[in-house]
């Protein structure tokens, strides 16, 4: 490739070339050691960006130039953290706004980008200092561990099964709680909340089982009979529940690998998870499938407001609230 460039007459910046087990590349430090490739962004950059987000949230407006600079820094991080990308959309939209919103000339209301900035701040304060992601080299020599998560939800409960290398390793079944109903504003037994519960069971499963693949190459198949939940897993964006989408992105942002495969499974084929989600159906007729042994059942934390990092008051993170016009 280099010879081709030379033949074409392109000049090369040899002084920028690097070789070895540790190199710096467009703002990242990349090292190879002990069978791992580690990519990191220096703590000085991350600390400065954290303070920039804090100070921006204390203001009412931001200039276009300042917002463009902030978005550029956030985009630099999003290159390493895939789950940041959905939140970048809000910044790009503010920069490209075409309709008047009564903001002062050359400025943008902070309230129009506040939800993205607040999410960034939660992530940054949960993972302070140098941002690091690691990948094991030997995981690139084979397709990786194959894992599947079967999910289902009903207006009465939630169920999921984790399968690794074709072996069931964990499962859970839980009724919808008072906290679930209060936070997501649906009634128990009301089918109007079905898509919300499908998204919630995805979040719970990913939070529980993310450590299984956090730093490993894993072919993860998320199987559900609900297309909206699958779309959420694929894009980390949802019109159903912005809260669940933000929480899911926060979990995914802390993993080196994302689920690679999303699969729709007809309800009749999603038998185990379907049965688990309907254990509390007042019409009855559902039992725990025989293949799901009791010792593999895992406890699910209580899902009150403390379960959701993005529901914590911004005062807890040391950021002031912005106000609009």
At which residue positions do the language-model features occur?
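Short secondary-structure boundary/capping segments
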Residues: 1-2, 30, 84-85, 94, ...
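C-terminal functional segments of enzyme domains
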Residues: 24, 28-35, 255, 259-313
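Mobile genetic element proteins and their domesticated derivatives, centered on retroelements
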Residues: 5, 27, 71-72, 91, ...
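RNase H catalytic domain
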Residues: 1, 207-272
């Amino acid at each position: 490739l280099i010879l081709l460039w030379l033949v074409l007459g392109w000049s090369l910046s040899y002084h920028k070339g690097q070789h070895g087990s540790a190199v710096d590349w467009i703002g990242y430090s990349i090292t190879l050691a002990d069978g791992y490739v580690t990519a990191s962004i220096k703590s000085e950059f991350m600390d400065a960006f954290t303070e920039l987000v804090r100070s921006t949230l204390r203001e009412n407006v931001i200039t276009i130039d300042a917002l463009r600079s902030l978005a550029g820094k956030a985009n630099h991080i999003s290159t390493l953290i895939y789950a940041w990308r959905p939140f970048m959309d809000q910044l790009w939209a503010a920069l490209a706004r075409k309709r008047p919103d009564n903001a002062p000339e050359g400025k943008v209301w902070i309230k129009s980008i506040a939800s993205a900035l607040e999410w960034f701040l939660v992530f940054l304060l949960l993972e302070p200092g140098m941002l690091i992601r690691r990948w094991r080299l030997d995981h690139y020599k084979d397709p990786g561990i194959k894992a599947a998560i079967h999910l289902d939800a009903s207006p009465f409960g939630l169920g999921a099964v984790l399968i690794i290398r074709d072996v069931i390793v964990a499962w859970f079944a839980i009724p919808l709680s008072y906290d679930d109903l209060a936070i997501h504003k649906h009634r128990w037994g009301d089918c109007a909340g079905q898509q919300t519960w499908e998204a919630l069971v995805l979040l719970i499963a990913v939070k529980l089982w993310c450590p299984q693949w956090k730093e490993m190459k894993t072919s993860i198949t998320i199987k559900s009979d609900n297309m909206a939940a699958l779309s959420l897993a694929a894009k980390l964006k949802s019109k159903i529940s912005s809260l669940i989408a933000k929480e899911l992105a926060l979990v995914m942002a802390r993993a080196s690998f994302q689920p690679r495969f999303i699969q729709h499974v007809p309800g009749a084929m999603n038998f185990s998870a379907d049965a688990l989600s309907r254990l509390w159906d007042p019409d009855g007729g559902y039992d725990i499938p025989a293949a799901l042994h009791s010792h593999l059942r895992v406890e699910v934390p209580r899902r009150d407001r403390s379960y959701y990092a993005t529901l914590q008051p911004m005062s807890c993170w040391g950021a002031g609230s912005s106000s609009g016009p």
